[in-house]
Swiss-Prot record:
Domains as described in the record: The SUMO-interacting motif (SIM) is required for efficient transactivation function.
Self-association and partners: Interacts with host SUMO-modified form of TATA-binding protein (TBP)-associated factor 12/TAF12 in a SIM-dependent manner; this interaction increases the transactivation activity of IE2. Interacts with host CHAF1A. Interacts with several components of the host transcriptional machinery including TBP, TF2B and CREB1. Interacts with host DNA replication licensing factor MCM3. Interacts with host PLSCR1; this interaction inhibits IE2 transactivating activity.
Modified residues (Phosphoserine): S203, S205
Listed Polar residues bias regions: 99-133
A GO CC term attached to the entry: host cell nucleus
Glycyl lysine isopeptide (Lys-Gly) (interchain with G-Cter in SUMO) cross-link, renumbered residues: K175, K180
Name this protein carries in UniProt: Viral transcription factor IE2
One GO BP annotation of this record: symbiont-mediated perturbation of host cell cycle G0/G1 transition checkpoint
MF term (GO), any: metal ion binding
C-alpha cells in the first residue's frame, strides 16, 4: 500500500477532487452509507418525472424485479444500479397516475421499498409491479419544467400502490322464457265483467296534472264484500293504451256543473246546497275502482295509476281517491229543506223550457219561478202588506185583556240586509235575557207552485164543511205538482210569551225595528189553538198572573206610614223656608 497514492476521481460526484489520504477498507456499513449518500445526491441533482404522460408504455416482458436489476448490473458494469432503480421508480409512479401536485415529502406504495440495508443483502421486499407498464428512461428537467427537485438530507421510503380497477357489475341474464305476457285489465262489478272502454279515468285537479297518481296495491287486490263494490284484477296496462272516449256514468251520477250556486250572501243554504249535492251519489250503492299501472307510459312516460270512483269508499281500506275541494259548512237548517228531502226520496222534478235571466219575475210566470234550481227567491223589500204599529199594538192589548196569551205569539220577518240583520241580532240578545219567553232561531219559508182550483173543487169542499167533521175527514182533495219548491231569502222568527207582561215587554223591543226599517222588518201577532205553552214550566206563572189581578195588595205597616208622613212634613217645611 503506497501512502502517496491518491484516490481516483469519482465519476458519480465530479465536485469531489483528488485526495492524498489513504483509502480506508470498505465495510458493509460504509457501503450502505455511501449508497444512501449517493442516492440522495442523485435525487437532488436529478429530477423524477412523476405522472408524465410522455413516458412510453412498455410490454410486460420488460418488467424486472429488484433482484433482476441488481444481477443485471453486476453482470454489466456499464449499468448503474441507481439509474436503473430510478427508472423503475419513475415508471411505477407514472403508471399509478401520481403527479407533482399530489406528491409530498413521503410517497406511500406497496410495490417498491428502498431501505438503508447493505447492498450485498437485499431486503425481502422487492419491486414487483404486476400488470404495470414501465417507461423507458427518466425524464429530464427540460422535458417537465413544472417538476421541482426534492431537497432533503434524510433517507426516505417510497411506497407506490397501483390503482385498483373497479369491479365489474354483473347483471343477471333474463331468459326469453321467463318473460310472461301480462294479463288483461278487467273490472268485475256485481259478478259481471265490465268492458274497460266504459271506464272514465279521473285525475285530480290542477295539482296532479302531469304527475303520477300513486295508489296502494292492497286497495286494488283486497276482496270486496258489498254487492255494489267492484273488484279489480291485475291492472298492468299503461294509461297510454286506454285512450277510450268517455261514456256516461253507468251508476247514474248527477252532473256537478248542472246546478248553479246562489249569489245571495244571506241565504247560505242556497250557496252550499249545490256543493252538498256534488258530495252525494245515487242511492244504488257506492262503488270505487282503483287500478295501478306498471311500466312506461301514461302521464309524462312515468309509472302512473288511474282511479274510477263514485260514492263512498269501501269500509275495508282508506280513501285513495283524488282530493276534492272542501265544501262550505252546511248548517242543520239547510239540510232540513223540503227540496233536499224530495231529492233524497228520488222525487222527479219537471224542468220547464223557460228562459232564465236576471231581473224580476212576473206573478203569472209560474214555470220560470219554480224551475229546477238551487237559487232562492230574492227580495230587497218584503213582498207583502206590512201592518202599521198601531194595528199591532191594538191586537196585543186585546189579547192581554183576556189574561191568557198561551194561544198568541209574535212573528218577526226581516230581509237579508246586513244592517237589518245586525239590529235584529241585538234585539235577540236582549230578548234572551228576559223571563218567560220561548224564542225560535231564524228559519226559512219554502213555497210551492200556486194553482187556482176549479169551481167544482170549491163546491165539494164547502159541502164537506157544512156536513161536519166526518165529511171533512173523508174529503180527499190532494192536488200535486212536479215543479221544484223554492225558498224565499227573508228570515222568520217566532216569540212565545207566558204572561201579558212578557208579551208586551217583548213587543216593546221589536216595534222599534219596525219603525226604523218600515219595508224590511215586519212584526205581527198570530193566533194558535188552545194548546199549552212550549214547555209546562210556564203554566204556574200564567195562572199566578190571572189570580193576582183579583187579590188585594197587602197593607203598608204603620211604621212605614209614620215615616212617610214625617217625610212629607219635612218637605213642606223646606218649601216654606225657601219661599221666605
Amino acid at each position: 500500500m503506497e501512502s502517496s497514492a491518491k484516490r481516483k476521481m469519482d465519476p458519480d460526484n465530479p465536485d469531489e477532487g483528488p485526495s492524498s489520504k489513504v483509502p480506508r477498507p470498505e465495510t458493509p456499513v460504509t457501503k450502505a452509507t455511501t449508497f444512501l449518500q449517493t442516492m440522495l445526491r442523485k435525487e437532488v441533482n436529478s429530477q423524477l418525472s412523476l405522472g408524465d404522460p410522455l413516458f412510453p408504455e412498455l410490454a410486460e416482458e420488460s418488467l424486472k424485479t429488484f433482484e433482476q436489476v441488481t444481477e443485471d448490473c453486476n453482470e454489466n458494469p456499464e449499468k448503474d444500479v441507481l439509474t436503473e432503480l430510478g427508472d423503475i421508480l419513475a415508471q411505477a409512479v407514472n403508471h399509478a397516475g401520481i403527479d407533482s401536485s399530489s406528491t409530498g415529502p413521503t410517497l406511500t406504495t406497496h410495490s417498491c421499498s428502498v431501505s438503508s440495508a447493505p447492498l450485498n443483502k437485499p431486503t425481502p421486499t422487492s419491486v414487483a409491479v404486476t400488470n404495470t407498464p414501465l417507461p423507458g428512461a427518466s425524464a429530464t428537467p427540460e422535458l417537465s419544467p413544472r417538476k421541482k427537485p426534492r431537497k432533503t438530507t434524510r433517507p426516505f421510503k417510497v411506497i407506490i400502490k397501483p390503482p385498483v380497477p373497479p369491479a365489474p357489475i354483473m347483471l343477471p341474464l333474463i331468459k326469453q322464457e321467463d318473460i310472461k305476457p301480462e294479463p288483461d285489465f278487467t273490472i268485475q262489478y256485481r259478478n259481471k265483467i265490465i268492458d274497460t272502454a266504459g271506464c272514465i279515468v279521473i285525475s285530480d285537479s290542477e295539482e296532479e296534472q302531469g304527475e303520477e297518481v300513486e295508489t296502494r296495491g292492497a286497495t286494488a287486490s283486497s276482496p270486496s264484500t258489498g254487492s255494489g263494490t267492484p273488484r279489480v284484477t291485475s291492472p298492468t296496462h299503461p294509461l297510454s293504451q286506454m285512450n277510450h272516449p268517455p261514456l256516461p256514468d253507468p251508476l247514474g251520477r248527477p252532473d256537478e256543473d248542472s246546478s248553479s250556486s246562489s249569489s245571495s250572501s244571506c241565504s247560505s243554504a242556497s250557496d252550499s246546497e249545490s256543493e252538498s249535492e256534488e258530495m252525494k251519489c245515487s242511492s244504488g250503492g257506492g262503488a270505487s275502482v282503483t287500478s295501478s299501472h306498471h311500466g312506461r307510459g301514461g302521464f309524462g312516460g312515468a309509472a302512473s295509476s288511474s282511479l274510477l270512483s263514485c260514492g263512498h269508499q269501501s269500509s275495508g281500506g282508506a280513501s285513495t281517491g283524488p282530493r276534492k275541494k272542501k265544501s262550505k259548512r252546511i248548517s242543520e237548517l239547510d239540510n232540513e229543506k223540503v227540496r233536499n228531502i224530495m231529492k233524497d226520496k228520488n222525487t222527479p222534478f219537471c224542468t220547464p223550457n223557460v228562459q232564465t235571466r236576471r231581473g224580476r219575475v212576473k206573478i203569472d210566470e209560474v214555470s220560470r219561478m219554480f224551475r229546477h234550481t238551487n237559487r232562492s227567491l230574492e227580495y230587497k223589500n218584503l213582498p207583502f202588506m206590512i201592518p202599521s204599529m198601531h194595528q199591532v199594538l191594538e191586537e196585543a192589548i186585546k189579547v192581554c185583556k183576556t189574561m191568557q196569551v198561551n194561544n198568541k205569539g209574535i212573528q218577526i220577518i226581516y230581509t237579508r240586509n246586513h244592517e237589518v240583520k245586525n239590529e235584529v241580532d241585538q234585539v235577540r240578545c236582549r230578548l234572551g235575557s228576559m223571563c218567560n219567553l220561548a224564542l225560535s232561531t231564524p228559519f226559512l219559508m219554502e213555497h210551492t207552485m200556486p194553482v187556482t182550483h176549479p169551481p167544482d173543487v170549491a163546491q165539494r169542499t164547502a159541502d164537506a164543511c157544512n156536513d161536519g167533521v166526518k165529511a171533512v175527514w173523508n174529503l180527499k182533495e190532494l192536488h200535486t205538482h212536479q215543479l221544484c219548491p223554492r225558498s224565499s231569502d227573508y228570515r222568520n222568527m217566532i216569540i212565545h210569551a207566558a204572561t201579558p207582561v212578557d208579551l208586551l215587554g217583548a213587543l216593546n223591543l221589536c216595534l222599534p225595528l219596525m219603525q226604523k226599517f218600515p219595508k224590511q222588518v215586519m212584526v205581527r201577532i198570530f193566533s194558535t189553538n188552545q194548546g199549552g205553552f212550549m214547555l209546562p214550566i210556564y203554566e204556574t206563572a200564567a195562572k199566578a198572573y190571572a189570580v193576582g189581578q183579583f187579590e188585594k195588595p197587602t197593607e203598608t205597616p204603620p211604621e212605614d206610614l209614620d215615616t212617610l208622613s214625617l217625610a212629607i212634613e219635612a218637605a213642606i217645611q223646606d218649601l216654606r223656608n225657601k219661599s221666605q
